[in-house]
Amino acid sequence: MNQTYGRLVSRAAIAATAMASALLLIKILAWWYTGSVSILAALVDSLVDIAASLTNLLVVRYSLQPADDEHTFGHGKAESLAALAQSMFISGSALFLFLTSIQNLIKPTPMNDPGVGIGVTVIALICTIILVTFQRWVVRKTQSQAVRADMLHYQSDVMMNGAILIALGLSWYGWHRADALFALGIGIYILYSALRMGYEAVQSLLDRALPDAERQEIIDIVTSWPGVSGAHDLRTRQSGPTRFIQIHLEMEDNLPLVQAHFVADQVEQAILRRFPGSDVIIHQDPCSVVPREGRKFELV
């Protein structure tokens, strides 16, 4: 699993970096020729794309390193740090767009030949849609937080390019403030995406529990297993591609230790079949030592 995960995530990061670099060159020429503030917004966003995707590429490779003596749980948290760094990059570009857009609203500047800008934006839109489609497939296969953050970033680019097309079309017909208005709206959306991305990264760094649906699946697996009378203290978190799952099983007092170990091992294998690559720790408790109120699951 780790080899497949590493290959897919690395390819997604390389594809994003290459795409952003190519689009940056095209947008520089288009902005120089047209003077459009919307294209300038897209140009700045491409600079941020390159910085973010390069950060992703380096961090993902680091996060895939195996656990060592100093990092016994692995290096998966590096993905969350990459997502947090991306949110900072994106917030900076959004603030730049705010300032540039307000300046052009106050003093609008007609652009040269909007047709060139429209052509460039159509190319950028098509390329970005292709990239997002590939990233979505990688996220579905790997659940990588770093690639998901990158995908959210490029999804905002799709919306941005669509808005730029409308703005350039309106400017072509003489409404020059449309360019700045749409750039301002794009900046607001980008800032919202950045804040959401940063929130998710911080939650991961704080060891937020797995989603309710996944925890419920773990509960269903454990409670349906023969020989398990109950369970409690389910604790979960995720670091990179690895889920960490801890749970206490309640078993009959007179169950031999060997049999208790066998049941716990079978439960562990069942959880691993559902969540491959997880780190599962199971503790066995005699029913008599578990308080009555502890017989139910406590989702921690």
Swiss-Prot record:
Known role: Divalent metal cation transporter which exports Zn(2+), Cd(2+) and possibly Fe(2+). May be involved in zinc and iron detoxification by efflux.
Source species taxonomy: Bacteria, Pseudomonadati, Pseudomonadota, Gammaproteobacteria, Enterobacterales
Binding residues for Zn(2+): D45, D49, H153, D157
Protein name per its UniProtKB record: Cation-efflux pump FieF
Species of the source: Salmonella paratyphi A (strain AKU_12601)
SUPFAM superfamilies attached to this UniProt entry: Cation efflux protein cytoplasmic domain-like (SSF160240), Cation efflux protein transmembrane domain-like (SSF161111)
Transmembrane segments: 24-44, 82-102, 114-134, 156-176, 178-198
Principal localisation: membrane
Biological process (GO), any one: intracellular zinc ion homeostasis
